[in-house]
Amino acid sequence: MRDSIENISQLQKKLNDLQLENQILKNILDKAGLSYHKELSKLRQSGSKEAFDPEQGKRIIHPQAITENMANQFFSMFWGRQDVYAKRSVNKETGKAAYYPQCNNFWTNVCHKKIKDGINCKDCKNRSYKTITKKDILNHLQGNAYNASDVIGVYPLLSNGTCRFMVFDFDNHDKDAEEKDFANSDDTWVEEVESMREICVLNGIEPLVERSRSGRGAHVWIFFDKPIDASFVRKFGFALLDKGAEQINLKSFKYYDRMLPAQDSLPEDSAVGNLIALPLQGKALQDGNSAFIDGNWNAYPNQWETLFNKPRLSQEFLEEKIKEWSNTIDDIAANAAESDREKPWNRMQHFNKNDVEGKLHIILANGIYVDNCLLYTSPSPRD
């Protein structure tokens, strides 16, 4: 028994040493501007010989019928507010798609959209939101509407300030992106989504990655086993991104649009928070979009099995991770500060311009700033 305990102790010490060595080597690579993330992903996927399948829709095994029980199970994973929900709508003239909260008074004589007096839904005194029903969920999953007007979106932030899931959104929400179902304009977003997936895996989280209905965007879903305070969930999400910034060398994260829930609590102006379109949209699924995908970006054949087998995180897990990451970040900062004090002349803070993209404008506070290039070429003003 004593020998077993000693062996376990030795193995634990060896594991700690390897983890420390691993972190040191990662820091060296980061300082040198070398990315280990892509190589790590290649090694992890080397065991899989399956290449990307161009026939994504045909990969999916569609159930013969979507039952009410399946709809209930589906909503238990994507549990948003039940007293209000949104549906997709396409403008016949512009072709732009948008999601609107469903109201019992929509387009009646008291509806401000019909009156066109500029009053928003959240400020409308005649507002009467519809509650989500099993029929709405079934229509979403079946996808019988030719223009996908049966697609629904939910509001993750519940009225009591909790949420049952979080999602990282990699869709394009720039101006006029609605015309192409919020599709991204190039393929850089794919690398960023893979980075987000890798960040989760490196930290013991099994996310569910969904390719958006456009086929050129994604959502990274994380589920909880019970409602958790939204402010704490957002704290966890930001801590996860901070930790990921230490682990993965990525030039930019420009296609990461937002994290939902997007607020710590509901605002007092009767707003319902931000919405997210739900996956497994029947019509888009026929093309392999709005589908859950693996590391090779292939749609899982059995979408339902993949969804229901995805583990849900507990609040205790979130608490442990935040504590763990806080200690790690504090230790690294303390060690860096100590090194600066001991041998400041031997330490250089390296900056590699290839590690970042874009421009940074720095303006001195309480100073005079004139953003006018002609100022330097025009004749000097006279007294």
Predicted regions mapped to residue ranges:
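Conserved small/polar residues in nucleotide/adenosyl-binding loops
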Residues: 376-383
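Secondary-structure boundary/capping micro-motif
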Residues: 4, 19, 28, 44-46, ...
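DNA replication initiation modules
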Residues: 151-190, 194, 225-368
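Signature for HUH/AEP ssDNA processing cores
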Residues: 2, 57-216, 223-239
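Intrinsically disordered, low-complexity linkers and terminal tails enriched in Pro/Gly
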Residues: 37-66, 326-350
